């Protein structure tokens, strides 16, 4: 089976400042991958390269054995969907109108997918609300529904796609964080490749198949949660002492102990 996505020595720099350096990566169809690391580690820049939002200044990123730079914007939008870290809407669109922006097929065909997206993020009661009146978490869920609709409409034409999420749980309460993680897990089981930036190491360890750990622009670790969530590695990358235990499923979880002086 061909890889869903590959990066070969992919780097990105602005002038003489390297933001991401020589990342090599192979992502299989249906994998759920979490990208973790401290602020400024290069996580969002890496995700933007993997999505095609920016081109590597060196190396290459390929999706389905084809360089991302060769896709037209329309074809790229049909094959991958991206939830940005910040999406500000300054106009009084309704929740329905925002979500429908993700559809690229006939509305009659997309209607069941639209209804499913609204249900998945628990926004049935908010369909007609002005999005500018919603809380930050409600707005984030609205945009997640839009991205899901885009993904599913694209998959109707192209088959299993790619879902990229930049800090998708940043404004969500614990219930909706778990809802989103479960939804990402279901997408992966259906064949979608999911890559998400997460700051919650425990959420990453519980739901991800693999964890990529970024540090100072480099891919420092790539492996299973048990292989990456280790006290020595966490201390080196995050500069904090952490105790690693196991939950009832065997997944590692961390407890802050004492920051290094």
Swiss-Prot record:
Coiled coil: none annotated. Part of the ABC transporter complex HmuTUV involved in hemin import. Responsible for energy coupling to the transport system. It is a peripheral membrane protein. It comes from the Bacteria. Keywords: ATP-binding, Cell inner membrane, Cell membrane, Membrane, Nucleotide-binding, Translocase, Transport. Belongs to the ABC transporter superfamily. Heme (hemin) importer (TC 3.A.1.14.5) family. This is Hemin import ATP-binding protein HmuV. It is found in: Cell inner membrane. GO terms for cellular component: plasma membrane. It comes from Rhodopseudomonas palustris (strain BisB5). It is an enzyme of class 7 (translocase). GO terms for molecular function: ATP binding; ATP hydrolysis activity. The gene is hmuV. ATP binds at residues 37-44. Its EC number is 7.6.2.-. PANTHER family: HEMIN IMPORT ATP-BINDING PROTEIN HMUV.
């Amino acid at each position: 089976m061909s890889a869903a996505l590959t990066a070969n020595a992919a780097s990105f720099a602005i002038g003489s400042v390297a933001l991401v350096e020589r990342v090599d990566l192979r992502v299989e169809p249906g994998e759920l991958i979490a990208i973790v690391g401290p602020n400024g580690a290069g996580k969002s820049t890496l995700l933007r390269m993997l999505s095609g939002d920016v081109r590597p200044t060196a190396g290459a990123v390929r999706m389905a054995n084809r360089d991302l730079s060769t896709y037209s914007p329309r074809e790229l939008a049909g094959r991958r969907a991206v939830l940005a870290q910040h999406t500000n809407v300054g106009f009084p669109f309704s929740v329905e109108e925002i979500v429908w922006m993700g559809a690229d097929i006939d509305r009659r065909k997309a209607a069941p997918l639209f209804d499913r997206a609204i249900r998945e993020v628990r926004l049935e009661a908010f369909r007609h609300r002005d999005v500018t009146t919603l809380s930050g978490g409600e707005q984030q869920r609205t945009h997640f529904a839009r991205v899901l609709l885009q993904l599913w409409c694209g998959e109707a034409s192209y088959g299993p796609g790619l879902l990229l999420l930049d800090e998708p749980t940043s404004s969500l309460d614990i219930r909706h964080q778990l809802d989103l993680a479960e939804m990402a897990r279901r997408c992966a089981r259906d064949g979608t490749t999911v890559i998400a930036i997460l700051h919650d190491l425990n959420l990453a360890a519980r739901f991800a198949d693999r964890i990529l750990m970024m540090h100072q622009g480099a891919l420092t670790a790539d492996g299973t949660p048990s292989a990456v969530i280790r006290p020595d590695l966490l201390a080196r990358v995050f500069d904090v002492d952490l105790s690693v235990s196991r939950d009832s499923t065997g997944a590692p979880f961390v407890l802050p102990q004492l920051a290094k002086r």
